[in-house]
Amino acid sequence: MNLLGRALVVMPVAITLLPLCGLSSHSDRNTCPDFIVTAAPVYTPLAELQGQERFPNGAQLLLVHEGKAEPLVQGFAATADADVSFDGKLVLFAGKKSASDPWQIWELTLQDRYVRKVIETAGDTERPLYLPSGRLLWAQRTAYGFQIESADDGHLPRQVFLNPTAGPGILPLTYVHASAFPTDVLADGRILFESNFPLGEGSTPELYTVYADGSGVESYRCDHGRGRWGGTQLASGDVVFTHGASLARFTSPLAQEDPIEAPAAEYAGGIAETASGEWLLSARAGGGAHYAIRLWSPSFTSKPGAAKLETVLAITGIDLVEPALITPRTRPNRHPSGLHPWDYANLLALDARLSHEGDVITPPASVRLEVQNERGVVAAMGTASVERDGSFFVKVPADAPIRFVLLDEKGSVLRREKGWFWIRKGEQRICVGCHTGPERASENRVPAVLLRTTVAVDLTAGATRPNANAAAEGN
């Protein structure tokens, strides 16, 4: 029997369990709703961004019901990553029937404990999340780490998919040569995921969003610096995440993250917000300790912040992460996909001189498109003129990592995007500048390139040879 199995057998003497939520100095305590956690002898934060195993010694989902913790399902060698359906009746999870199996996606009906396999592939499929309109998404292990994919969830659709060109069937949502791992589905229908920054190149964890058809990828905020991961959206619309040793949030009025004054601890990320606004979260005292489920009331909610974290569930020698409340929740908006049935995409830049890193002083004369093939080799696909106001309009390859390079009149590099992004087949995208940040709006004017022509410069059939200058010029 492995360490996890032994720990769960002795669960009655190894558990610290506080079955109440709404903890305060008053007597009006509320019973905590049932919740699910992933229990593992070892949880390795951020292993997913290296394409590695987060639970190298196995894991098991526990259901905490009326103050008692027990395995959520039977007959599995390993289970993890619970996501409760919007009506609170079903649970998606990653599971292995035998230890040698890859992770696959399963669904549990809570009322009768019926389990069915939802997704089966040759490799690991992890972190499933429900999407509206009868679909789900997950992280698929690939040669480049994890990539996000989506598919029908197997239920009779209550609503048709809003654009047939984006489904049905299995649909890849990310197209970059680096791990992308989902963390939440936002209220507006976008998918929140973590990857490294710069995207496709860097090593600093960052939070990004993408629509349910794989279009519109962007970083959530552009105040890049410290690593942040484990993002979850609250009922208020704020997104809470962890730096590891601290918590912070993205809130609508601010273009940069807002620190959260939380008790000193290491936070795993992925909180669960109760109806009263309190948080169930996974935290530990330090690197040598194990994660436990704690309860905390942040100071910016209706209840005053607690002086310390209250332990709700702890198991000796076991990490407890990913709390998920078993309760109905608001269904996110469906994304009305605007993709066309094309094998290319159009991109309009309003002012390529603008950047979050500082505007380009020397006016760019042209822009070069670079694309990364399946082997990671960079090829230059051609150039397009940049207008005096910084605008350009191009037709680009779709569903592949791309980036732009600004050139002066002599063809020398003024600035190259540090990372990569993709644009979906049939997508028509407008950018304010080059990595300006979602908080920056465009000037109220017609871009000069559209006054000259409404035909995009075709950069889809450029040179296929590797770009010899890319390595020498640096990123």
Where would I find each of the regions flagged by the language model?
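Residue position within the beta-strands of beta-propeller blades
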Residues: 35-46, 90-94, 136-141, 191-195, ...
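Structural motif
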Residues: 58-60, 100-106, 146-161, 201-208, ...
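Multi-bladed beta-propeller domains
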Residues: 65-78, 109-124, 161-178, 211-227, ...
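Short, acidic Ser/Thr/Gly-rich low-complexity loop/linker segments typical of extracellular
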Residues: 70-74, 376-389
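Conserved beta-propeller blade repeats
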Residues: 76-86, 90, 122-135, 177-194, ...
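Asp-box/WD-like beta-propeller blade repeats and closely related beta-sheet repeat scaffolds
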Residues: 102-104, 114-161, 169-179
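C-type cytochrome heme c attachment motif
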Residues: 106, 137-138, 161, 190-194, ...
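Sequence context surrounding c-type heme c attachment/ligation sites in exported
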Residues: 316-319, 388-475
